[in-house]
Amino acid sequence: MTPVTFALDLQRRQWEQAAELVDRTSAASDRAETVSEVSVGKTPNEVVYKENKLRLLHYESKTETQYDVPILIVYALINRPYILDLQPDRSVVQTLLEQGFDVYLIDWGEPSRLDTHLTLDDYVTRYIDNCVDIVRDRSGQDSINLLGYCMGGTMSVMYAALFPEKVRNLGLMAAGLVFDDTGGVLERWGDEQYYSPKAVTDAFGNVPSEFLDVGFALMDPVENFVTKYVRLFENVENESFVENFSRMEQWLSDGIDVAGETYKQFLEDVYQQNKLAQNELMLDGKQVDLERLEMPILQIVGEYDHLIPPEASKPFNDLVPSEDTEVIEGATGHIGLSVSSRSHGDLWPAVSDWFAERSETGTDETPDSETEETRPDSQAEETDETPDEGLKPQAAASNETVAEEPEPQVVESNETTEEELEPQAVEANETAPEELESIDGIGPTYAERLASVGITSVSGLAAADPSEIAATIDVPVSRVTAWVEQASDRTD
Protein backbone atom coordinates (compact mmCIF):
# COMPACT_ATOMS: atom_id res chain seq x y z
CA MET A 1 0.00 0.00 0.00
CA THR A 2 1.44 3.36 -1.07
CA PRO A 3 1.23 6.45 1.13
CA VAL A 4 -1.45 7.83 -1.17
CA THR A 5 -3.68 4.75 -1.07
CA PHE A 6 -3.17 4.50 2.71
CA ALA A 7 -4.33 8.10 3.15
CA LEU A 8 -7.33 7.54 0.89
CA ASP A 9 -8.27 4.34 2.74
CA LEU A 10 -7.98 6.09 6.10
CA GLN A 11 -10.14 8.95 4.85
CA ARG A 12 -12.74 6.50 3.54
CA ARG A 13 -12.98 4.72 6.88
CA GLN A 14 -13.34 8.01 8.72
CA TRP A 15 -16.21 9.02 6.45
CA GLU A 16 -17.90 5.63 6.98
CA GLN A 17 -17.58 5.94 10.75
CA ALA A 18 -18.94 9.49 10.60
CA ALA A 19 -21.92 8.32 8.54
CA GLU A 20 -22.55 5.48 11.00
CA LEU A 21 -22.38 7.95 13.89
CA VAL A 22 -24.96 10.18 12.18
CA ASP A 23 -27.28 7.20 11.65
CA ARG A 24 -27.01 6.08 15.27
CA THR A 25 -27.42 9.61 16.58
CA SER A 26 -30.54 10.02 14.46
CA ALA A 27 -31.93 6.77 15.84
CA ALA A 28 -31.19 7.88 19.40
CA SER A 29 -34.00 10.44 19.39
CA ASP A 30 -36.45 7.76 18.25
CA ARG A 31 -35.25 5.37 20.94
CA ALA A 32 -35.68 8.04 23.62
CA GLU A 33 -39.42 7.63 23.15
CA THR A 34 -39.03 3.86 23.45
CA VAL A 35 -37.17 4.29 26.74
CA SER A 36 -39.92 6.45 28.20
CA GLU A 37 -42.71 4.07 27.19
CA VAL A 38 -41.45 0.68 28.41
CA SER A 39 -43.60 -1.01 31.04
CA VAL A 40 -42.74 -3.65 33.64
CA GLY A 41 -44.56 -5.98 36.00
CA LYS A 42 -47.69 -6.20 33.86
CA THR A 43 -48.94 -9.71 34.69
CA PRO A 44 -52.48 -9.25 36.11
CA ASN A 45 -52.72 -9.66 39.88
CA GLU A 46 -54.73 -8.65 42.90
CA VAL A 47 -53.67 -7.63 46.40
CA VAL A 48 -55.08 -10.21 48.81
CA TYR A 49 -53.36 -9.05 52.01
CA LYS A 50 -51.66 -5.93 53.39
CA GLU A 51 -49.59 -5.34 56.49
CA ASN A 52 -47.57 -2.20 57.11
CA LYS A 53 -45.83 -1.57 53.75
CA LEU A 54 -46.18 -5.19 52.64
CA ARG A 55 -48.57 -6.33 49.90
CA LEU A 56 -49.28 -9.97 49.11
CA LEU A 57 -50.01 -10.33 45.39
CA HIS A 58 -52.01 -13.18 43.85
CA TYR A 59 -51.54 -13.60 40.10
CA GLU A 60 -54.31 -14.40 37.66
CA SER A 61 -54.20 -18.03 36.53
CA LYS A 62 -53.19 -18.87 32.96
CA THR A 63 -54.49 -22.45 32.88
CA GLU A 64 -57.87 -24.08 33.45
CA THR A 65 -56.51 -26.23 36.27
CA GLN A 66 -53.67 -25.63 38.70
CA TYR A 67 -51.49 -27.79 40.91
CA ASP A 68 -52.86 -28.40 44.39
CA VAL A 69 -49.94 -26.73 46.18
CA PRO A 70 -49.42 -23.00 45.45
CA ILE A 71 -46.07 -21.23 45.19
CA LEU A 72 -45.29 -18.21 47.37
CA ILE A 73 -42.37 -16.16 46.03
CA VAL A 74 -40.36 -14.46 48.77
CA TYR A 75 -38.37 -11.63 47.23
CA ALA A 76 -35.39 -9.78 48.70
CA LEU A 77 -35.72 -6.61 50.77
CA ILE A 78 -33.54 -4.81 48.19
CA ASN A 79 -34.96 -3.50 44.88
CA ARG A 80 -38.45 -4.14 43.54
CA PRO A 81 -39.80 -7.64 42.87
CA TYR A 82 -40.88 -6.92 39.28
CA ILE A 83 -37.49 -8.23 38.11
CA LEU A 84 -39.39 -11.55 38.27
CA ASP A 85 -42.00 -10.13 35.89
CA LEU A 86 -39.89 -7.79 33.78
CA GLN A 87 -41.45 -8.52 30.40
CA PRO A 88 -43.90 -11.16 29.14
CA ASP A 89 -41.38 -13.40 27.37
CA ARG A 90 -38.87 -13.26 30.25
CA SER A 91 -41.08 -13.45 33.32
CA VAL A 92 -40.58 -16.03 36.05
CA VAL A 93 -44.11 -15.32 37.24
CA GLN A 94 -45.57 -15.87 33.76
CA THR A 95 -43.60 -19.08 33.28
CA LEU A 96 -44.90 -20.56 36.53
CA LEU A 97 -48.46 -19.51 35.71
CA GLU A 98 -48.26 -21.06 32.24
CA GLN A 99 -47.02 -24.30 33.79
CA GLY A 100 -50.18 -24.49 35.91
CA PHE A 101 -49.06 -23.10 39.25
CA ASP A 102 -51.07 -20.88 41.57
CA VAL A 103 -48.60 -18.04 42.21
CA TYR A 104 -48.35 -15.53 45.06
CA LEU A 105 -45.58 -12.95 45.64
CA ILE A 106 -44.58 -10.79 48.60
CA ASP A 107 -43.97 -7.16 47.63
CA TRP A 108 -42.26 -5.72 50.70
CA GLY A 109 -42.72 -2.06 49.80
CA GLU A 110 -40.29 0.51 51.18
CA PRO A 111 -39.73 1.00 54.92
CA SER A 112 -40.24 4.45 56.40
CA ARG A 113 -38.30 5.99 59.26
CA LEU A 114 -40.84 4.40 61.59
CA ASP A 115 -39.65 0.98 60.39
CA THR A 116 -35.96 1.50 61.22
CA HIS A 117 -36.14 -0.93 64.13
CA LEU A 118 -37.76 -3.80 62.23
CA THR A 119 -35.59 -6.91 62.52
CA LEU A 120 -35.28 -10.22 60.72
CA ASP A 121 -37.47 -11.57 63.51
CA ASP A 122 -40.28 -9.30 62.28
CA TYR A 123 -39.83 -10.11 58.60
CA VAL A 124 -39.50 -13.87 59.05
CA THR A 125 -41.64 -14.85 62.03
CA ARG A 126 -44.36 -12.23 61.53
CA TYR A 127 -44.61 -10.95 57.95
CA ILE A 128 -43.67 -14.13 56.06
CA ASP A 129 -45.62 -16.30 58.49
CA ASN A 130 -48.75 -14.19 58.09
CA CYS A 131 -48.46 -14.37 54.29
CA VAL A 132 -47.94 -18.13 54.39
CA ASP A 133 -51.05 -18.52 56.53
CA ILE A 134 -53.09 -16.45 54.08
CA VAL A 135 -51.93 -18.62 51.17
CA ARG A 136 -52.61 -21.79 53.16
CA ASP A 137 -56.12 -20.64 54.00
CA ARG A 138 -56.91 -19.61 50.43
CA SER A 139 -55.57 -22.85 48.94
CA GLY A 140 -56.83 -25.24 51.58
CA GLN A 141 -53.33 -26.71 51.93
CA ASP A 142 -51.58 -27.33 55.24
CA SER A 143 -48.20 -26.68 53.62
CA ILE A 144 -47.16 -24.71 50.54
CA ASN A 145 -44.20 -24.20 48.20
CA LEU A 146 -41.73 -21.40 48.96
CA LEU A 147 -39.47 -19.89 46.28
CA GLY A 148 -37.01 -17.37 47.71
CA TYR A 149 -34.79 -15.11 45.59
CA CYS A 150 -31.46 -13.75 46.87
CA MET A 151 -31.97 -12.39 50.39
CA GLY A 152 -35.52 -13.72 50.14
CA GLY A 153 -34.04 -17.20 49.75
CA THR A 154 -32.00 -16.78 52.91
CA MET A 155 -35.09 -15.63 54.80
CA SER A 156 -37.07 -18.55 53.34
CA VAL A 157 -34.55 -20.97 54.84
CA MET A 158 -34.96 -19.28 58.21
CA TYR A 159 -38.73 -19.51 57.93
CA ALA A 160 -38.74 -23.16 56.83
CA ALA A 161 -36.51 -24.12 59.76
CA LEU A 162 -38.85 -22.39 62.21
CA PHE A 163 -42.12 -23.54 60.61
CA PRO A 164 -41.30 -26.76 58.71
CA GLU A 165 -44.86 -28.02 58.96
CA LYS A 166 -46.00 -25.15 56.72
CA VAL A 167 -43.43 -25.63 53.93
CA ARG A 168 -43.93 -28.51 51.51
CA ASN A 169 -41.08 -27.76 49.08
CA LEU A 170 -38.32 -25.16 49.37
CA GLY A 171 -36.86 -23.48 46.29
CA LEU A 172 -33.82 -21.23 46.76
CA MET A 173 -32.72 -18.95 43.94
CA ALA A 174 -29.27 -17.33 44.26
CA ALA A 175 -29.59 -17.52 48.04
CA GLY A 176 -26.62 -16.55 50.20
CA LEU A 177 -26.37 -19.31 52.81
CA VAL A 178 -22.75 -20.30 53.49
CA PHE A 179 -20.12 -17.62 54.09
CA ASP A 180 -16.90 -19.43 54.90
CA ASP A 181 -14.59 -17.70 52.41
CA THR A 182 -17.16 -18.72 49.79
CA GLY A 183 -19.13 -15.49 49.39
CA GLY A 184 -16.92 -13.71 46.87
CA VAL A 185 -16.41 -9.96 46.80
CA LEU A 186 -19.36 -9.10 49.04
CA GLU A 187 -18.09 -11.35 51.81
CA ARG A 188 -14.61 -9.84 51.56
CA TRP A 189 -15.87 -6.26 51.53
CA GLY A 190 -18.25 -7.01 54.37
CA ASP A 191 -15.62 -8.61 56.60
CA GLU A 192 -15.85 -7.24 60.13
CA GLN A 193 -12.18 -6.21 59.90
CA TYR A 194 -13.08 -3.60 57.30
CA TYR A 195 -16.79 -2.93 57.53
CA SER A 196 -19.19 -2.03 60.33
CA PRO A 197 -22.92 -2.35 59.54
CA LYS A 198 -23.65 -0.61 62.84
CA ALA A 199 -21.70 2.48 61.76
CA VAL A 200 -23.84 2.65 58.61
CA THR A 201 -27.16 2.30 60.43
CA ASP A 202 -26.06 4.74 63.14
CA ALA A 203 -25.39 7.29 60.41
CA PHE A 204 -28.44 6.70 58.21
CA GLY A 205 -31.08 4.82 60.18
CA ASN A 206 -32.56 2.94 57.24
CA VAL A 207 -29.84 2.10 54.71
CA PRO A 208 -30.40 4.28 51.60
CA SER A 209 -30.94 2.57 48.26
CA GLU A 210 -28.34 4.88 46.68
CA PHE A 211 -25.72 3.60 49.13
CA LEU A 212 -26.54 0.00 48.22
CA ASP A 213 -26.69 0.71 44.47
CA VAL A 214 -23.21 2.24 44.38
CA GLY A 215 -21.77 -0.68 46.34
CA PHE A 216 -23.22 -3.26 43.96
CA ALA A 217 -22.14 -1.28 40.88
CA LEU A 218 -18.55 -1.00 42.14
CA MET A 219 -18.28 -4.79 42.24
CA ASP A 220 -17.97 -4.67 38.43
CA PRO A 221 -17.23 -1.00 37.64
CA VAL A 222 -16.11 -1.33 34.01
CA GLU A 223 -19.26 -3.23 33.04
CA ASN A 224 -21.62 -1.00 35.02
CA PHE A 225 -20.15 2.40 34.17
CA VAL A 226 -18.66 1.91 30.68
CA THR A 227 -19.28 -1.32 28.79
CA LYS A 228 -23.06 -1.48 29.02
CA TYR A 229 -23.40 2.06 27.63
CA VAL A 230 -21.02 1.27 24.77
CA ARG A 231 -23.15 -1.78 24.06
CA LEU A 232 -26.28 0.38 24.08
CA PHE A 233 -24.77 2.80 21.56
CA GLU A 234 -23.73 -0.05 19.30
CA ASN A 235 -27.29 -1.43 19.35
CA VAL A 236 -29.24 1.82 19.47
CA GLU A 237 -30.91 1.00 16.14
CA ASN A 238 -32.21 -2.29 17.55
CA GLU A 239 -35.55 -1.42 19.14
CA SER A 240 -35.87 -4.73 20.99
CA PHE A 241 -32.40 -4.32 22.52
CA VAL A 242 -33.20 -0.78 23.65
CA GLU A 243 -36.48 -1.92 25.22
CA ASN A 244 -34.74 -4.67 27.19
CA PHE A 245 -31.97 -2.29 28.24
CA SER A 246 -34.52 0.30 29.38
CA ARG A 247 -36.48 -2.18 31.48
CA MET A 248 -33.32 -3.30 33.25
CA GLU A 249 -32.20 0.29 33.88
CA GLN A 250 -35.64 1.14 35.24
CA TRP A 251 -35.39 -1.72 37.72
CA LEU A 252 -31.79 -0.93 38.69
CA SER A 253 -32.67 2.69 39.42
CA ASP A 254 -35.84 1.79 41.33
CA GLY A 255 -34.13 0.76 44.55
CA ILE A 256 -35.62 0.83 48.02
CA ASP A 257 -34.14 1.52 51.43
CA VAL A 258 -33.59 -1.35 53.88
CA ALA A 259 -34.70 -1.24 57.51
CA GLY A 260 -31.62 -0.39 59.57
CA GLU A 261 -31.82 -3.10 62.23
CA THR A 262 -32.54 -5.78 59.63
CA TYR A 263 -29.53 -4.70 57.55
CA LYS A 264 -27.26 -4.76 60.59
CA GLN A 265 -28.58 -8.12 61.80
CA PHE A 266 -28.33 -9.76 58.38
CA LEU A 267 -24.78 -8.55 57.68
CA GLU A 268 -23.46 -9.41 61.14
CA ASP A 269 -25.20 -12.75 61.71
CA VAL A 270 -25.30 -14.21 58.21
CA TYR A 271 -22.29 -12.70 56.39
CA GLN A 272 -19.76 -11.89 59.08
CA GLN A 273 -20.43 -14.65 61.62
CA ASN A 274 -21.93 -17.31 59.32
CA LYS A 275 -24.44 -18.21 62.02
CA LEU A 276 -27.03 -19.67 59.67
CA ALA A 277 -24.68 -22.27 58.19
CA GLN A 278 -23.23 -23.03 61.62
CA ASN A 279 -26.74 -23.64 62.97
CA GLU A 280 -26.32 -20.92 65.59
CA LEU A 281 -28.81 -18.33 64.34
CA MET A 282 -31.59 -17.29 66.72
CA LEU A 283 -34.80 -15.50 65.71
CA ASP A 284 -37.55 -14.48 68.08
CA GLY A 285 -35.82 -16.38 70.87
CA LYS A 286 -35.77 -19.66 68.91
CA GLN A 287 -32.97 -21.51 67.16
CA VAL A 288 -33.17 -21.56 63.38
CA ASP A 289 -32.42 -25.27 63.43
CA LEU A 290 -31.27 -26.62 60.08
CA GLU A 291 -32.03 -30.14 61.30
CA ARG A 292 -35.71 -29.38 60.78
CA LEU A 293 -35.23 -28.90 57.04
CA GLU A 294 -36.41 -32.32 55.93
CA MET A 295 -38.60 -31.10 53.05
CA PRO A 296 -37.40 -31.29 49.41
CA ILE A 297 -34.93 -28.48 48.64
CA LEU A 298 -33.98 -27.06 45.23
CA GLN A 299 -31.00 -24.75 44.76
CA ILE A 300 -31.10 -22.53 41.64
CA VAL A 301 -27.69 -20.91 41.06
CA GLY A 302 -25.89 -18.90 38.39
CA GLU A 303 -22.48 -20.09 37.29
CA TYR A 304 -21.29 -16.49 36.79
CA ASP A 305 -23.09 -14.94 39.75
CA HIS A 306 -20.64 -12.42 41.25
CA LEU A 307 -23.06 -11.29 43.99
CA ILE A 308 -23.85 -14.75 45.39
CA PRO A 309 -21.33 -17.24 43.94
CA PRO A 310 -22.54 -20.85 43.67
CA GLU A 311 -20.06 -21.72 46.42
CA ALA A 312 -22.14 -19.63 48.84
CA SER A 313 -25.25 -21.68 48.05
CA LYS A 314 -24.52 -25.26 46.98
CA PRO A 315 -22.70 -26.49 50.14
CA PHE A 316 -25.84 -25.76 52.13
CA ASN A 317 -27.45 -28.95 50.82
CA ASP A 318 -24.86 -30.93 52.79
CA LEU A 319 -25.88 -29.22 56.03
CA VAL A 320 -29.51 -30.34 56.07
CA PRO A 321 -31.11 -33.75 56.69
CA SER A 322 -33.39 -33.60 53.64
CA GLU A 323 -33.01 -36.68 51.46
CA ASP A 324 -34.43 -34.87 48.43
CA THR A 325 -32.07 -32.08 47.40
CA GLU A 326 -31.11 -30.87 43.95
CA VAL A 327 -29.02 -28.12 42.32
CA ILE A 328 -29.91 -26.57 38.97
CA GLU A 329 -27.05 -24.38 37.71
CA GLY A 330 -27.48 -22.03 34.78
CA ALA A 331 -24.71 -20.47 32.69
CA THR A 332 -25.67 -16.94 33.71
CA GLY A 333 -25.29 -14.35 36.46
CA HIS A 334 -27.31 -13.18 39.44
CA ILE A 335 -29.92 -11.15 37.57
CA GLY A 336 -29.69 -13.33 34.47
CA LEU A 337 -31.30 -16.16 36.42
CA SER A 338 -34.59 -14.29 36.22
CA VAL A 339 -34.37 -12.34 32.93
CA SER A 340 -31.99 -13.98 30.46
CA SER A 341 -33.39 -15.77 27.42
CA ARG A 342 -31.19 -18.79 28.16
CA SER A 343 -32.65 -19.11 31.66
CA HIS A 344 -36.19 -19.03 30.33
CA GLY A 345 -35.33 -21.49 27.59
CA ASP A 346 -33.57 -24.08 29.74
CA LEU A 347 -33.52 -23.36 33.46
CA TRP A 348 -37.09 -22.42 34.32
CA PRO A 349 -38.69 -25.38 32.54
CA ALA A 350 -36.47 -27.60 34.73
CA VAL A 351 -37.47 -25.67 37.85
CA SER A 352 -41.15 -25.97 36.92
CA ASP A 353 -40.76 -29.73 36.47
CA TRP A 354 -39.17 -30.01 39.90
CA PHE A 355 -42.05 -28.23 41.62
CA ALA A 356 -44.63 -30.06 39.48
CA GLU A 357 -43.39 -33.47 40.62
CA ARG A 358 -43.91 -32.42 44.24
CA SER A 359 -47.04 -30.25 44.07
CA GLU A 360 -49.86 -32.78 43.82
CA THR A 361 -51.45 -34.24 46.94
CA GLY A 362 -53.39 -37.36 47.72
CA THR A 363 -51.05 -40.27 46.90
CA ASP A 364 -48.05 -41.93 48.48
CA GLU A 365 -45.81 -41.61 45.44
CA THR A 366 -42.76 -39.38 45.79
CA PRO A 367 -39.97 -38.49 43.40
CA ASP A 368 -36.64 -40.23 43.77
CA SER A 369 -34.95 -38.72 46.81
CA GLU A 370 -31.37 -38.80 45.65
CA THR A 371 -29.30 -35.65 45.85
CA GLU A 372 -28.39 -34.51 42.37
CA GLU A 373 -27.05 -31.58 40.43
CA THR A 374 -28.20 -30.62 36.96
CA ARG A 375 -27.16 -28.05 34.41
CA PRO A 376 -30.03 -27.13 32.07
CA ASP A 377 -27.83 -25.42 29.47
CA SER A 378 -26.64 -26.84 26.19
CA GLN A 379 -23.40 -28.09 27.74
CA ALA A 380 -25.09 -30.05 30.52
CA GLU A 381 -24.19 -33.70 30.76
CA GLU A 382 -27.06 -36.04 29.97
CA THR A 383 -28.01 -38.67 32.53
CA ASP A 384 -29.80 -41.96 32.19
CA GLU A 385 -32.55 -40.77 34.50
CA THR A 386 -35.16 -38.37 33.18
CA PRO A 387 -38.42 -37.43 34.88
CA ASP A 388 -41.51 -39.06 33.50
CA GLU A 389 -43.73 -36.81 31.46
CA GLY A 390 -46.73 -35.37 33.23
CA LEU A 391 -47.23 -34.84 36.92
CA LYS A 392 -45.57 -36.80 39.69
CA PRO A 393 -47.69 -36.36 42.81
CA GLN A 394 -46.01 -36.03 46.17
CA ALA A 395 -47.16 -37.88 49.25
CA ALA A 396 -49.78 -36.16 51.38
CA ALA A 397 -48.58 -33.92 54.20
CA SER A 398 -47.89 -35.67 57.47
CA ASN A 399 -50.93 -34.20 59.18
CA GLU A 400 -53.28 -35.34 56.42
CA THR A 401 -54.96 -38.75 56.30
CA VAL A 402 -53.95 -40.60 53.14
CA ALA A 403 -56.37 -43.49 53.47
CA GLU A 404 -59.68 -43.72 55.26
CA GLU A 405 -59.57 -45.01 58.82
CA PRO A 406 -60.84 -48.61 59.04
CA GLU A 407 -64.20 -49.14 60.69
CA PRO A 408 -63.77 -50.01 64.37
CA GLN A 409 -64.37 -53.69 65.07
CA VAL A 410 -66.39 -54.88 68.03
CA VAL A 411 -64.34 -57.05 70.38
CA GLU A 412 -65.98 -59.35 72.89
CA SER A 413 -65.27 -58.46 76.49
CA ASN A 414 -63.25 -61.62 77.06
CA GLU A 415 -61.15 -61.11 73.91
CA THR A 416 -58.10 -58.94 73.48
CA THR A 417 -56.79 -57.76 70.13
CA GLU A 418 -53.13 -57.98 69.27
CA GLU A 419 -52.93 -54.19 69.15
CA GLU A 420 -54.25 -53.90 72.70
CA LEU A 421 -51.56 -56.19 74.08
CA GLU A 422 -48.68 -53.90 73.13
CA PRO A 423 -49.36 -50.96 75.45
CA GLN A 424 -49.98 -53.39 78.33
CA ALA A 425 -46.29 -54.28 78.26
CA VAL A 426 -45.66 -51.15 80.34
CA GLU A 427 -46.25 -51.80 84.00
CA ALA A 428 -48.66 -49.56 85.89
CA ASN A 429 -45.87 -47.76 87.72
CA GLU A 430 -43.80 -47.19 84.56
CA THR A 431 -44.06 -44.65 81.75
CA ALA A 432 -43.01 -45.03 78.14
CA PRO A 433 -39.63 -43.40 77.34
CA GLU A 434 -39.88 -39.84 76.00
CA GLU A 435 -38.95 -39.54 72.34
CA LEU A 436 -35.59 -37.95 71.51
CA GLU A 437 -37.23 -35.81 68.83
CA SER A 438 -39.09 -33.92 71.55
CA ILE A 439 -35.75 -32.21 72.31
CA ASP A 440 -35.29 -28.93 70.44
CA GLY A 441 -32.72 -29.42 67.69
CA ILE A 442 -33.07 -33.19 67.35
CA GLY A 443 -34.80 -34.35 64.19
CA PRO A 444 -34.98 -37.83 62.67
CA THR A 445 -31.41 -37.67 61.36
CA TYR A 446 -29.81 -36.83 64.70
CA ALA A 447 -32.15 -39.23 66.51
CA GLU A 448 -30.86 -41.98 64.23
CA ARG A 449 -27.24 -41.02 64.92
CA LEU A 450 -27.88 -41.04 68.68
CA ALA A 451 -29.59 -44.42 68.43
CA SER A 452 -26.51 -45.79 66.67
CA VAL A 453 -24.53 -45.17 69.90
CA GLY A 454 -27.23 -46.59 72.15
CA ILE A 455 -29.09 -43.41 73.12
CA THR A 456 -32.79 -43.87 72.37
CA SER A 457 -34.54 -41.89 75.11
CA VAL A 458 -34.43 -38.51 76.81
CA SER A 459 -33.30 -40.12 80.07
CA GLY A 460 -30.46 -41.85 78.25
CA LEU A 461 -29.42 -38.56 76.68
CA ALA A 462 -29.46 -36.82 80.08
CA ALA A 463 -26.88 -39.30 81.37
CA ALA A 464 -24.58 -39.03 78.36
CA ASP A 465 -21.21 -37.30 78.14
CA PRO A 466 -21.52 -34.43 75.59
CA SER A 467 -17.87 -34.53 74.49
CA GLU A 468 -17.86 -38.26 73.88
CA ILE A 469 -21.18 -38.21 72.01
CA ALA A 470 -20.16 -35.19 69.89
CA ALA A 471 -16.98 -36.91 68.75
CA THR A 472 -18.81 -40.14 67.95
CA ILE A 473 -21.71 -38.75 65.91
CA ASP A 474 -19.80 -35.82 64.38
CA VAL A 475 -21.85 -32.98 65.90
CA PRO A 476 -20.48 -29.82 67.60
CA VAL A 477 -20.00 -30.21 71.36
CA SER A 478 -22.01 -27.04 72.00
CA ARG A 479 -25.04 -28.52 70.26
CA VAL A 480 -24.86 -31.85 72.13
CA THR A 481 -24.37 -29.99 75.41
CA ALA A 482 -27.59 -28.05 74.76
CA TRP A 483 -29.43 -31.32 74.09
CA VAL A 484 -28.10 -32.90 77.30
CA GLU A 485 -29.08 -29.83 79.33
CA GLN A 486 -32.63 -29.97 77.95
CA ALA A 487 -32.83 -33.69 78.69
CA SER A 488 -31.52 -33.18 82.23
CA ASP A 489 -34.11 -30.48 82.91
CA ARG A 490 -36.88 -32.88 81.89
CA THR A 491 -35.64 -35.80 83.96
CA ASP A 492 -34.84 -33.90 87.17
UniProtKB/Swiss-Prot annotation:
Residues 362-371, 379-388 have a biased composition (Acidic residues). This is Poly(3-hydroxyalkanoate) polymerase subunit PhaC. It comes from Haloferax mediterranei (strain ATCC 33500 / DSM 1411 / JCM 8866 / NBRC 14739 / NCIMB 2177 / R-4). The keyword Acyltransferase applies. GO terms for molecular function: acyltransferase activity; nucleotide binding. Heterodimer with PhaE. Gene3D superfamilies: 5' to 3' exonuclease, C-terminal subdomain, alpha/beta hydrolase. Belongs to the PHA/PHB synthase family. The active site is at residues 150, 305, 334. The gene is phaC. Coiled coil: none annotated. InterPro entries: AB_hydrolase_1, AB_hydrolase_fold, DNA_repair_Rad51/TF_NusA_a-hlx, PHA/PHB_synthase, PHA_synth_III_C. Involved in the production of polyhydroxyalkonic acids (PHAs), which are water-insoluble biopolymers used as intracellular energy reserve material when cells grow under conditions of nutrient limitation. PHAs are composed primarily of 3-hydroxybutyric acid (3HB) and 3-hydroxyvaleric acid (3HV). Required for the production of poly-beta-hydroxybutyrate (PHB) and poly(beta-hydroxybutyrate-co-beta-hydroxyvalerate) (PHBV). PHB and PHBV are desirable bioplastic due to their biodegradability, biocompatibility, and mechanical properties. However, PHBV has better mechanical properties than PHB. Residues 70-336 form the AB hydrolase-1 domain. Disruption phenotype: Depletion of both phaC and phaE genes leads to complete loss of PHA synthase activity and PHBV production.
